[in-house]
Amino acid sequence: MAESLLSLDDLAVQFKVGSMLAGGIKTLKAVDGVTLDVKPGECLGLVGESGCGKSTLALAIMGLVLPTRGRIHVGGQQISGDKPPDRMAMARTVQMVFQDPYASLNPRQTVRRTLADPLHLHGVGDKAEVEARVIDMMAKVGLRPEHADRYPHEFSGGQRQRIGIARALILKPKLVICDEPVSALDVSIRAQIINLLLELKDEMGLAYIMISHDLGVVEHVSDRVAVMYLGRIVEQGGWQEIFENPRHPYTRALIAAIPDPFHRAAATVAGAKAKGEIASALNPPPGCHFNPRCPIKADLCTVEAPVLEGVAPGHLAACHFRDRLI
């Protein structure tokens, strides 16, 4: 079995919010004890509703927020701890494609400078080599070389996201975190960007973490899927196991919401739909965080948090009644 490219061990990210003058200081548990791994060349889908902690987890992996607890290993090297990680070294291994192509690009920089700056910063090649890599990367993402001196406002949303993808890949990283990479784009071009990401994954040997609330996208691109709810992983496994045999009520609720007749098996299970809205991470429910919305909860669920345990080879679920959900 291949060594993990990325390993997270009991990772937690907490923020202090409020003030002593406004009701006191509270702790927001954005990420709460996450253990995950990503293999080289693999695509891990990370799904859940807004507010589940997916983007905060991504920022912790990138070194943009410091974890409160736990360890992060990238390529066998621990990057978490008391000191901030070496951002220069991290950038050569892990990169990120952001959700909003309109906000993630510097409006004062041309495409050429946007792509060349990381190469200059890391001392990659001379002027001719930098230019060659910029033009080559533009071609890889479907941009015309003669547009290298244009500014972001001269491109469509889909083209801007292609620039963002090119910027993420220009240093040839091993892992790319895609944070809702198509949610801000027109429906008509979402498939183009997803297919581009898949082509680049195969061509460059990339591993992805694909963050999305759109399970249709995740099913299409992922080898494995992790389901996150209020900072915790509640289920993970191979994409086929997750979509065809979900063993957590929250996963079933997400699948039931897909407007796709091929997934009606999960949707027609009695009580598949979740009740109400996601709770606040400032005041999560005791026990299983999903219990206020769960259609099969019992008294145990309100006092004891279930452990993420195996239900099949490579398939884990955190539910006291995981064995009943078959």
Question: Where are the language model's segments positioned?
Answer:
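ABC ATPase NBD coupling module
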Residues: 20-25, 79-95, 121, 127-128, ...
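Short catalytic/signature loops enriched in Gly
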Residues: 2-4, 18-22, 27, 238-326
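The feature captures the beta-strand-to-loop junction immediately N-terminal to the Walker
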Residues: 47-48
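Conserved ABC ATPase signature
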Residues: 151-155, 159
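Helix-to-loop junction immediately C-terminal to a conserved catalytic motif
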Residues: 62
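Conserved ABC ATPase "signature" region
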Residues: 128-146, 255-256
